[in-house]
Amino acid sequence: MKLGESMKKNATLSVKIIAFLGVLIFTVMPVANAMHIMEGYLSPKWCIIWGILVLPFLIKGSLNVKKVVSDDQRIKLLFAMAGAFIFILSALKLPSFTGTSSHPTGIGLSTILFGPAITTVLGVIVLLFQALLLAHGGISTLGANSFAMAVMGPLMAYGVYKILQKIKIPQNINIFFSATVGDLFTYCITAIQLGIDHPLEYDGIFASIERYLGVFAITQIPIAIAEGILTVLIFNVIAKYSSKELGKLGILNNSEEAEL
């Protein structure tokens, strides 16, 4: 009975969080085009290169999913919720004063729960569905968008998380900085991708990258901070109801579980 009640609580928690985020997506989504790189904006050469670079991480992540997720139904619920978190946050389209739009990435939560490789799998799936169902991003640019948001963003978030964990920074502060920096780094990679493929005629690649970084920074810095705060809030809710599962994933130790 305890197992059934626990699973029911986890399922209810997942539904509540996803419903809350769903309200956000439907109230904000009608604005502009989001800043996944759109269909046809990159040259075929770079589309192929970025796609090839994603493949090793995707293969590694697929193998990790089988090891981590397959044995425990409650961890499967966390896996599904982490994917929904990425889908909904990265589909939010927030207008920018620069004439573009920006969005959160949502990759911090999954990276902390499951690591960067599994987050790559979730990120690629999310980007594929967004391209097919929401015309958000594109099929030809799937590799580039995946490399930025599903590979490099999670790797940076994970690196920050482990470094801050090693020097014993409090968990909430650690999660905030990990999610925030992971979001910002995703946009740095996107700026590099755009700058390489669209160098300025006279000033070259580096000036183009600098221009894209300047365009993104105006809105992406506050968005990244907001994402960091939201990630902390969602993680604390998960920790309250699923501390045993977080312990199995190696995120909480016994003393941290007792505090919750």
From Swiss-Prot:
UniProt-listed InterPro entries: CbiM, CbiM/NikMN
One Pfam family from the record: CbiM
Bridged cysteine pairs (disulfide): none
Superkingdom to which the source organism belongs: Bacteria
Localization annotation: Cell membrane
Membrane topology, from the record: Multi-pass membrane protein
Record key words, sorted: Cell membrane, Cobalamin biosynthesis, Cobalt, Cobalt transport, Ion transport, Membrane, Signal, Transmembrane, Transmembrane helix, Transport
Signal peptide: 1-34
Gene Ontology MF, one: cobalt ion transmembrane transporter activity
Assigned GO CC terms: ATP-binding cassette (ABC) transporter complex
Chain ranges passing through the membrane: 39-59, 77-97, 109-129, 132-152, 175-195, 215-235
Pathway field: Cofactor biosynthesis; adenosylcobalamin biosynthesis
GO terms, biological process: cobalamin biosynthetic process
Free-text function comment from the UniProt entry: Part of the energy-coupling factor (ECF) transporter complex CbiMNOQ involved in cobalt import.
Similarity remark: Belongs to the CbiM family.
Subunit-structure text: Forms an energy-coupling factor (ECF) transporter complex composed of an ATP-binding protein (A component, CbiO), a transmembrane protein (T component, CbiQ) and 2 possible substrate-capture proteins (S components, CbiM and CbiN) of unknown stoichimetry.
Protein's UniProt name: Cobalt transport protein CbiM
Organism per entry: Clostridium cellulovorans (strain ATCC 35296 / DSM 3052 / OCM 3 / 743B)
Lineage of source species: Bacteria, Bacillati, Bacillota, Clostridia, Eubacteriales
Gene, per the UniProt record: cbiM
